[in-house]
């Protein structure tokens, strides 16, 4: 029996990076799958902030993503995905586009939440370094939940939000994992 976390699914790794204090209260969470994995998403809401989610359409040419980046910082936080791409490029992981192992384009869909100014300074928000560090921190095993990573500045209806994860094995034997902010 597993931990009841998304990392119960073989090959899935999760990493967080966040900053608190001195005007900061935001972060980034990365779900990394070495070798890539099929993925999908459902974008809702009146002001969604996303990047590369069109690639998750089943009719798209790309059939694998290398990581998913979830971040605070509203639209500014989408910059964290660049750091995730940089980490993958340095590890020669991505969609091959040339003859050299380093000639790759990592496929990293991203989504953000609005947490601007939660720490007191509006301009303190995730950047590419947040994504790089969260990706480098990705591990299997127990996932830290609550006010970490992308959930650091999460608030809903005045209540503190955060990162949560779960997994379940269906009667068919298929293992399903989920992570949400």
Question: Which role fits each region the language model picked out?
Answer:
Residues 1-181:
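Alpha/propeptide regions of enzymes that mature by internal proteolysis
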């Amino acid at each position: 029996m597993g931990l009841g976390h998304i990392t119960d699914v073989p090959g899935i790794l999760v990493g967080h990076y966040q900053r608190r204090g001195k005007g900061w209260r935001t972060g980034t969470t990365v779900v990394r799958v070495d070798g890539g994995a099929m993925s999908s998403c459902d974008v809702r809401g009146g002001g969604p902030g996303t990047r590369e989610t069109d690639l998750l359409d089943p009719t798209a040419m790309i059939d694998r993503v290398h990581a998913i980046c979830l971040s605070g910082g509203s639209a500014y936080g989408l910059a964290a995905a660049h750091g995730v791409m940089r980490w993958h490029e340095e590890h020669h992981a991505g969609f091959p586009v040339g003859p050299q192992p380093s000639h790759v384009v990592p496929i990293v869909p991203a989504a953000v939440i609005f947490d601007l100014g939660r720490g007191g300074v509006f301009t303190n928000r995730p950047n590419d370094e947040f994504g790089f560090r969260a990706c480098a921190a990705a591990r299997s095993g127990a996932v830290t939940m609550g006010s970490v990573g992308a959930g650091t500045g999460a608030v809903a209806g005045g209540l503190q939000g955060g990162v949560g994860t779960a997994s379940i094995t269906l009667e068919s034997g298929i293992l399903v994992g989920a992570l949400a902010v």
